[in-house]
Amino acid sequence: MIDLLLQRPTSSDDKYSRGVIGFITGSEEYAGAAILGTTAAIRTGVGMVRYVGPRSVSQLVLESRPEVVLGLGKAQAWILGSGVSKQSIEQNAQIAQLIDDSKAEILIIDAGGLEHISTSFMAGARTILTPHRGEAVRLLERLSGESAARVEGSELAEAVQKATGCTVVLKGSKTLIASEAGVLECAEAPAELATAGTGDVLAGIMGALAAINFDEVAGGKAQLTDIAEAAVSVHTRAAEILAAKGPIAALDLANAVSQALVSLRN
């Protein structure tokens, strides 16, 4: 399935058939999250990237990636929350509105976006959550009203999945993917990935693959777990390529995604 999801574009493709992804990410405090995610998505091969955020961050995104389109618009997948703090009032309102209004888009919800997940969340069947352990524990405690400090690994991923109805990607040295079918343990990634911003890169890869393969997911030929697994594989391969040369920086990781795709396709 991963081979199918990572296929190269064909001569009949255009920028729209290659998928459109939207980002509501980054903030004045964490502007880099927007640059890392959009760069990773572009390097994954998505046809168009939209970005919604503060004016200062939007300017930084355009300076880094001039192909990005600013503002809301049609997209097959949305990345919500990476680098968005509680103080980002306008972005949080936009995230809440998009979650309420979206009917078919695939949602990848990360970091600050997880605050919008409640017991009444209704879009679990088309949503992937991407917490690290601390975020997963806080989310589970908020939803259950009980302490989850001692819940670990597969048990934690499964508990968050059951509480939300979403596909859950619990990030770590061995990333876990939880769905109604159970918990999948991904191959161990290089320890060098434990650095700021690499999760933003993973979200960008995952959203891009969701947009590129939207028709396969909508038609039942692929599941969100397949998208998540493929994204983790690309992320890990990019890290392996860089780790062979030394420490990893998140922007280098985002730019290495193209090379990782070539490696996996071969």
Over which residues does each language-model region extend?
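Small-residue (G/A/S/T)-rich helix-start motifs and N-terminal tracts that mark the onset
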Residues: 1-106, 115-128, 133, 138-266
